[in-house]
Amino acid sequence: MKTDIEIARSIELVKIKQVARETGIPVEHISNYGRYIAKVDESQINEEKVQQSNLILVTAITPTKAGIGKTTVSIGLALGLNKIGKKTIVALREPSLGPCFGMKGGAAGGGYAQVLPMDKINLHFTGDFHAITSAHNMISALLDNYLYQNRDNGFGLKEVLWRRVLDVNDRSLRYIVTGLGPKTNGITQESGFDITPASEIMAILCLAKDEKDLRRRIENILLGFTYDNKPFTVKDLGVAGAITVLLKDALSPNLVQTTEHTAAFVHGGPFANIAHGCNSILATKMAMTFSDYTITEAGFGADLGAEKFYDIKCRKAGVTPKLTVLVVTARALKMHGGVSQDKIKEPNLEALKQGVANMDKHLRNLRYFGQTVVVAFNRYGDDSEEEVDYIRTHCEKKGVGFAVNNAFTDGGEGAVELAELVVKTIEEQPSEPLQYAYDDEDSVETKISKVACNLYGASIITYSAAARKKLKHIVELGYGNFPICIAKTQYSFSTDPKIYGAVDNFEFHVQDIVMNAGAEMLVVIAGEIMRMPGLPKEPQALHIDIVNGEIEGLS
């Protein structure tokens, strides 16, 4: 079979204006970024139509290090639904350069279920990540200048919370010292870099309702504390207007096309392990405005992405999914059954049977939110019929709909079985009104306990001294009603990435809590998770090149 980029290049794209027209988007409200990409003015969102659309979340069991194909299934399902006559748009996150050149590769789908042009989407796209990175680091520069200019007059800060960001994986930048050298180089202080998808600016962009809300949230970003323990925000710095200007164009959702020329929105890109893991509210609502069915995905496993989708995104956006699709692979189930990563492609029915406990736990958790769930088996060429049949039978015994997805090899035709199951399930048994994992009024400790104990399976919650201090600050500053966003490993229900399966009765250690007052959420850092990833021993960058003007190795 051809590589992803070979398939992408073999498809003759249609002009984005044609995609817009066929979708019902007025072309006078799009701004072209070349022939095949456009931004759509957020004024085109119609809240009445949003409430009429069928929103479907695609999530997954705990993934392998190579991922699980959730984006491919999301795109494939959209193709399949369009194939059976249901007007459908997929709304996805933008890829980050970090994993694109690091371990996972790109995030534009795969095979014959991709969003196009995949090379541009995976690389610089419309410059949204550049704008977010620039806006974040502009705040850093302006804050450092404020500290320098006020170094002798008592108006400086006792504590600086704001770090920098960069859209690459670079472990050496996690902790740095700035302002070294002569005094004219600024105040010497400890700092560090997070990856751009973990930026609070990214979260704000994805949660903002409009430009006015964007500015309000930027004003509220907490930068540090004064010497008399008062919070110091971007509003105090006086630069909210300038930062909003940098993000003005980035706020508009990006319109592209699938491998079968149907519309797709790709906008925003927070990771689900270190951020809230969902594309922008504006892009999702735009898709819902112009479609009868909207497919969206949330990053990594359901313990991370789906929980945050329900408890943060849906809560803020006022939307409820009619159905959740849980993506499963035989490879991941075998890993959870004790097979090492290098042997998960080999048939092993006994290991798969053991690993099904991970799927069952995710199913139980999704039902905790009142969701009707169907299982999409994302098929690989090395899956045996016995493995597929076992999972199908297991799901049938549990009363869960099951369909095989072959969109990677067959495009929309390979997702018709899944599409028909989705439509039938929504018509006969749609999800109940969303039941959140916690209430806004719950204390922060209660919120953490409800997610960690009820969903992850923890038996005890412990806090570092730094986290305990933050809990006190949160109450004093009036941030206690914010939802929580737990940052932890994506490879386990626990905080230990080496413990697979359906682990229970473990200690859940809260290392720190980051107060994202602009995004209006509390990032709870658990275990040893890093908000700036490192590169693997053999990064994807080693396989990417340009030959005769054509990009090779991008996936």
UniProtKB/Swiss-Prot annotation:
Its EC number is 6.3.4.3. It catalyses: (6S)-5,6,7,8-tetrahydrofolate + formate + ATP = (6R)-10-formyltetrahydrofolate + ADP + phosphate. Pathway: One-carbon metabolism; tetrahydrofolate interconversion. GO terms for molecular function: ATP binding; formate-tetrahydrofolate ligase activity. GO terms for biological process: tetrahydrofolate interconversion. The keyword Cytoplasm does not apply. Keywords: ATP-binding, Ligase, Nucleotide-binding, One-carbon metabolism. CDD domains: FTHFS. ATP binds at T64, K65, A66, G67, I68, G69, K70, T71. NCBIfam families: PRK13505.1. Belongs to the formate--tetrahydrofolate ligase family. This is Formate--tetrahydrofolate ligase. The lineage of its organism: Bacteria, Pseudomonadati, Bacteroidota, Bacteroidia, Bacteroidales.
